[in-house]
Amino acid sequence: MTADATPYVTEDGRQIGGVMMDLRDITLRFGGVEAIKSISFDIREGEIRAIIGPNGAGKSSMLNVISGFYKPQEGEVHFRGKKRPPMRPYQVARQGVARTFQNIALFEGMSVLDNIMTGRMGHIKSNMLAQAIWAGKAQREENENREAVERIIDFLEIQAIRKTPVGRLPYGLKKRVELARALAAEPDLLLLDEPMAGMNVEEKEDMSRFILDVNDEFGTTIALIEHDMGVVMDLSDRVVVMDYGRKIGDGTPDEVRNNQEVIDAYLGVAHD
């Protein structure tokens, strides 16, 4: 079965593309516990797709399935119309999938620049022997990678801290550096696990702006987990809602916020 290439029009009239990733009847177990229970949904080219739900709903487990960290016992992942065989995370990354983590995973003793450079590993083609024999080619590759990183640094407005060790940065800037490292991989699909966690209002506004700009200017498809419902409703084209490993809602932000099962399980009241 091929992916649905039919464009989709969002609530604000923006047209997004056909299906990039299709998750079909995904079930994930840890021992006798079902973390994900036969969930299906898709992610379309160019959209911002939110995954929400209470703590323990299985949201991060779903991101781990998408990124190859977890192997579901049942179900299939289809990427651009082809069934994806079992893959390790680095193989999934080579397909154009990058992610950030709920808990920041940066190299604290390294500079901002060097941390972001680690995101370019998939773009380094020359091995050590090739670098020794064809020094000029290796140098050109190094320059290209550094130029790509510098563009991201400018884009995320972190020029002033580019040489600062990450361990000295406040939390909000660390989250921005982690986003920069993920963008350095030039992903087609970017997975963000609670990108606003621990941020103050100003930091959330900045991160929201950057996420929208990444989607708009780079054309990057984004799937994100977020607990701030204001952020979710403002950023997302579509939202899937999980509760105790089940899917209880899926649709536009308006459809989700008016879904009675979602209100009862998670939102509490309809959000204006």
Protein language model regions, located:
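Glycine-rich phosphate-binding loops of nucleotide-dependent enzymes
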Residues: 2-272
